């Protein structure tokens, strides 16, 4: 019984709603909104992004994991996503609050065919894609704060961290880390973030994380390949 209780406790901590009955057992009431490969592959309609989908309950940083995979040759479009980050980080090595099951904490591996000097446009491309995805969710007042934030009424909703590896002449790969606050409530934020952060839930957008992730990945793919096509046309 002790072993069963420990398993039930662990499942509840992951968001499973389980009812207990004295001397009768347990009943599963509701499954959590997890970003599992099975959940996402059933709904995701992309050609490249997320075809390789690396999912973890927890990790230090998705950018660190994605960088390791990229150095091993992971293909473009590989997505690394976690339910929580122990050491999430943003620009200038600032910490990024990444609690379990409350947001989208993910990194994307890109291998664009343009010169390194043009790499910063990937960050702008991502910001545009995210803003368009938010419009589809019903959030119309999200704005881009250059170079890597999306704000709503002055409060941060999204952080983007883009890291490039390559030479002066050629990009080997880009790891794009994105953090989106989805389910976090005002009272759940650390004191130092209460006045400067927001989430989709705090902006009255009620959406499952799986659906939000689907919209974001599909828009990221669309904007990225449009960007590559425009770059190719401009070079011809």
Regions found by a protein language model. Name each.
Residues 98-197, 201, 207:
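Nucleotide and nucleotide-moiety/phosphate-recognizing core
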Residues 1-136:
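N-terminal lobe of the biotin/lipoate ligase/transferase fold
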């Amino acid at each position: 019984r002790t072993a069963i209780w420990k398993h039930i406790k662990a499942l509840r901590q992951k968001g499973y709603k389980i009812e207990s009955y004295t001397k009768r057992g347990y009943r599963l009431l509701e499954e959590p909104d997890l970003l599992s490969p099975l959940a996402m592959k059933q709904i995701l309609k992309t050609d490249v992004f997320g075809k390789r989908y690396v999912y973890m309950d927890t990790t230090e940083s998705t950018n660190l994991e994605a960088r390791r995979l990229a150095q091993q040759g992971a293909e473009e479009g590989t997505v690394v996503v976690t339910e929580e980050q122990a050491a999430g980080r943003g620009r200038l090595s600032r910490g990024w609050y990444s609690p379990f099951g409350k947001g989208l904490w993910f990194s994307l591996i890109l291998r664009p065919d343009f010169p390194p000097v043009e790499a910063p446009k990937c960050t702008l491309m991502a910001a545009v894609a995210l803003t368009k995805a938010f419009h589809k969710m019903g959030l119309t007042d999200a704005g881009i704060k250059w170079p890597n934030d999306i704000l709503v009424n002055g409060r941060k909703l999204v952080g983007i961290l883009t890291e490039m590896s390559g030479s002066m002449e050629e990009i080997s790969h880009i790891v794009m880390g994105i953090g989106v606050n989805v389910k976090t409530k005002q009272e759940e934020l650390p004191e130092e973030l209460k006045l400067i952060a927001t989430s989709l839930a705090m902006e009255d957008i009620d959406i499952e994380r799986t659906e939000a992730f689907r919209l974001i990945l599909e828009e990221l793919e669309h904007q990225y390949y449009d960007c590559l096509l425009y770059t190719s046309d401009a070079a011809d």
